[in-house]
């Protein structure tokens, strides 16, 4: 029974993580959840900058990762952390406004 339970958890993990594996690029909003809830880029996922290494189990090291925040400061910190963890394609897209222009994405307001 324990083996079945473990397999089930793994299947759920793969199902939830599949979109991250399948995309050519990932857009990550590293702001706080409160900031995210005021609006974020279409297609972005939310991971606060200090938790950015949580992607290591689901995102390949050579995947292109765009990071943005309010001003570019926290996304710069997140980029540095990812670079040090071996992510060579981490890109600081700067502020949400700059990232919107760079990535040609709309802002989704909640």
Segments and roles (model prediction):
Residues 6-13:
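Sec-dependent signal peptide recognition
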């Amino acid at each position: 029974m324990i083996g079945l339970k473990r397999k089930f958890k793994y299947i759920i993990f793969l199902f939830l993580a599949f979109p991250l594996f399948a995309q050519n690029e990932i857009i990550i909003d590293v702001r706080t959840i409160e900031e995210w809830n005021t609006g974020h880029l279409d297609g972005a996922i939310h991971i606060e900058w200090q938790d950015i290494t949580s992607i290591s189990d689901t995102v390949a090291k050579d995947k292109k990762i765009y990071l943005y925040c309010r001003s570019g400061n926290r996304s710069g910190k997140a980029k540095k952390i990812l670079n040090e963890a071996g992510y060579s394609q981490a890109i600081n897209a700067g502020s949400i406004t700059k990232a919107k222009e760079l990535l040609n994405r709309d802002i989704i307001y909640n």
